[in-house]
Amino acid sequence: MNETESQWDKLLKIKTTGRDDSHADQYRYPYEPTPYSVLERLAERYGERKGLWGIEVINEPVTENMWETMKVPERYPAVDPELAEGSGSVTFDFLRGFYKDAYDRIRKYMPEEKYVVIHDGFELKAWKGYMQEEKYKNVVLDTHQYLMVAEANGCEQTMEGYLKYIREHFQKDIQEM
């Protein structure tokens, strides 16, 4: 098991511990799929389909900065504190390795004209220049610019304040990328 695979447990735990969209694991599968095997199976099953635009590796991973900015444990108290124990953010080193490994596994089954989508973990500029090597074809960086992040960063909660924040931060960052 490599470091990326062992750290996946940490990432998976965040998504299933009641932070934002918890659920009870009512169904036990005969095996525990890894995220890589799930991505491979998705790419194998749907990768050649005409209507498929692409596959996103993971939606909204919570990086260290976002974990602190959003005060995740306070904002989203765990439904099951025992299960949530030890959950936390993921590092950029982990995400960078995970995305490259996932890309390779998806590309085994999905042609290059389809897109592999990676999420910025709410830190758009941290990905500047990432996966730009010739090997990586049709990689799309997904970014979600939420005003609640602006609020957490001290944006005045008025129309004027939001518009100013959008111009000075979101618009500027997107243009730079």
Model-assigned labels for residue ranges:
Residues 1-113, 120-126:
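Active-site mouth of glycoside hydrolases
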Residues 86-90, 108, 113-116, 120, ...:
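Substrate-binding clefts and catalytic carboxylate motifs of secreted carbohydrate-active enzymes
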